[in-house]
A protein has these predicted regions:
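Conserved ATP-binding N-box helix of the HATPase_c
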Residues: 1-19, 27-54, 107-112
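N-terminal assembly/transducer modules of large multi-domain enzymes
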Residues: 1-5, 19, 153-156, 163-173
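Flexible phosphate/Mg2+-sensing switch loops adjacent to catalytic phosphate-binding sites
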Residues: 6-9, 23-25, 99, 120-163
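Short, solvent-exposed beta-strand-terminating loops
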Residues: 20-26, 71, 75
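Short, low-complexity, polar/charged sequence segments that are solvent-exposed and flexible
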Residues: 28-33, 83-87, 141-143
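A Trp-anchored, charged/polar loop motif used as the substrate-binding/catalytic surface
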Residues: 39-51, 158-173
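Flexible ATP-lid and adjacent glycine-rich G1/G2 motifs of the Bergerat
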Residues: 42-131, 136
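Basic, gly/Ser/Thr/Pro-rich low-complexity segments located predominantly at protein N termini
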Residues: 78, 110-112, 144, 162-165
Length: 173
């Protein structure tokens, strides 16, 4: 933390209209492909995929927002080993002070496991090396490998800028 005496953490449960979820139609199409692909999978997998697909048609989504203030946050730039990149892309990797507590890079999947559509969005506002306020936002879903338009896709999908990096111009999205 920048100043531990001034750190604030806020948790809010919000109801968000379906049309406010970035690329919800794209996620719905991917889940439909996963439903088709899951037919040969275990009952647990079939149930999880069908439930996620069904949940994508909701008119409103419950979204848990976790916000912290007065910390170093998930700063960039968007490359290894910086915190935002590591949180959204790395497995078993946790940059930072070696004395800090935590699950050493494995706990970051917990929000995905608790999402009805196995999807998270993360955003960060931080001061870059030049002292300017910088913003990043990116989405991530972990589903299953699937075919879409006769092309095999991996189990991890991302929402972001054209090349699947974080969106930095928040006004345009």
């Amino acid at each position: 933390a920048v100043d531990a005496s001034k750190v604030k953490v806020r948790f809010e449960l919000n109801s968000i209209p379906r049309n406010m979820i970035p690329d919800i139609e794209g996620l719905t199409r991917v889940l439909e492909c996963c439903v088709d692909m899951s037919k040969e999978e275990s009952e647990d997998t079939i149930t999880m995929v069908k439930d996620a697909y069904k949940n994508c048609s909701r008119m409103n989504f419950h979204v848990l927002s976790c916000t912290d203030f007065g910390t170093k946050g998930m700063a960039g730039p968007y490359d290894h080993p910086h915190p935002f990149y590591t949180y959204m892309n790395s497995k078993g990797s946790s940059p930072g002070d070696p004395s800090r507590a935590g699950s050493h890079g494995h706990g970051k999947d917990a929000p995905l496991a608790n999402s009805a559509v196995r999807t998270i969005f993360a955003s960060s506002t931080y001061r870059n090396d030049e002292g300017e306020m910088t913003h990043m936002a990116q989405g991530k879903c972990v589903l299953m490998s699937h075919y879409q338009d006769d092309v095999m896709h991996e189990n991890v999908g991302r929402w972001g800028a054209f090349n699947m990096t974080p969106v930095t111009d928040l006004e345009s999205h």
